[in-house]
């Protein structure tokens, strides 16, 4: 596989996402709203633990205020109270299902915008980046977005339900294997044996969920581009993988690498801000810097996600492109 063959779809996906930056911001706002909604039952459960069980709130929430760690801490504290634990888990389940459904519906509108941009942008990836080309690829509009949400809503909800079920089954299998490994190793080999088992299972889980999320994105792209059912989208995705295996795997490898680099940069930035917080007076600037880092991190991950979607879309629904001789304002090739 030649490098340009892989460069062009990735560049096209990046330019389509950049030209339609409002949907990137919209996806970020939707995800942030979902996380805020998810924090409500967790914070409520924390105060329930603090009041009913007389436990320290900071110990339950954890030092890093991570939602997953906080939810685990609350659930652990409520183990001795089945009714309270059931209510807490039910509240989280309601928020997860409702918030996820909201995200699934919005994703239909977002991909409808990207598909429309794909079909009107022309071969913009073959030319230097110009503002005129980005304007031509910008297809963000309320009508296109709402039409996409209405047209794809039912199918995206069905596909999303399958995704949530996959997450649930994968999580239960992970916990089962880790607990079984802990019991099999025993106290003598706890430090080494159980740690190795847990690390291996965690790595396998991350790899598996990465493949699941990639397949989920490709199915969404196919459904948005061809307006087909979930089953037909799965057939089309498999056909695309057989026909264009090298570039599909190449796009997957590049996008996963970019996400990994962005995650590493985020961790380093967070650690750096943590060190700054100990400096007198200078530490006062940490909060706005943390908010800025959170904003940039969220926008970057949403942008990478839509870049990946645009790259897969360019492989599946190749642009017809305007004639090379055609041009737009400023002498830029169309």
Model-identified regions with their sequence ranges:
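Hydrophobic alpha-helical membrane segments
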Residues: 1-334
């Amino acid at each position: 596989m030649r490098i340009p063959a892989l460069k062009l779809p990735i560049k096209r996906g990046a330019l389509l996402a950049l030209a339609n930056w409002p949907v990137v911001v919209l996806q970020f706002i939707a995800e942030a709203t979902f996380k805020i909604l998810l924090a409500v039952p967790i914070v409520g459960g924390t105060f329930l633990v603090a009041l009913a069980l007389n436990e320290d709130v900071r110990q339950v929430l954890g030092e890093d205020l991570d939602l997953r760690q906080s939810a685990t801490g609350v659930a652990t504290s409520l183990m001795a109270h089945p009714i309270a634990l059931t209510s807490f888990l039910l509240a989280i389940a309601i928020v997860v299902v409702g918030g996820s459904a909201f995200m699934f519906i919005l994703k239909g509108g977002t991909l409808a915008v990207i598909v429309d941009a794909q079909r009107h942008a022309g071969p913009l990836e073959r030319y230097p980046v110009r503002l005129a080309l980005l304007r031509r690829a910008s297809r963000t509009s309320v009508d296109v977005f709402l039409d996409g949400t209405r047209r794809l809503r039912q199918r995206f909800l069905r596909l999303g339900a399958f995704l949530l079920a996959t997450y649930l089954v994968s999580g239960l299998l992970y916990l089962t294997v880790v607990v079984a490994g802990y019991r099999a190793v025993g106290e003598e080999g706890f430090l080494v044996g159980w740690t190795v088992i847990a690390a291996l299972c965690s790595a396998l889980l991350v790899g598996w969920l990465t493949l699941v999320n990639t397949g989920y994105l490709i199915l969404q792209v196919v459904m948005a581009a061809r307006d087909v059912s979930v089953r037909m989208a799965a057939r089309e995705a498999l056909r695309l993988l057989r026909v264009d295996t090298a570039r599909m795997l190449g796009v997957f490898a590049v996008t996963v690498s970019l996400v990994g680099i962005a995650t590493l940069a985020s961790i380093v930035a967070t650690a750096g801000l943590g060190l700054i917080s100990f400096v007198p007076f200078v530490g006062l600037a940490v909060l706005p810097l943390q908010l800025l880092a959170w904003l940039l991190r969220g926008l970057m991950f949403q942008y990478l996600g839509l870049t990946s979607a645009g790259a897969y879309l360019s492989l599946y629904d190749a642009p017809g492109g305007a004639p090379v001789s055609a041009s737009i304002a400023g002498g830029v090739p169309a």
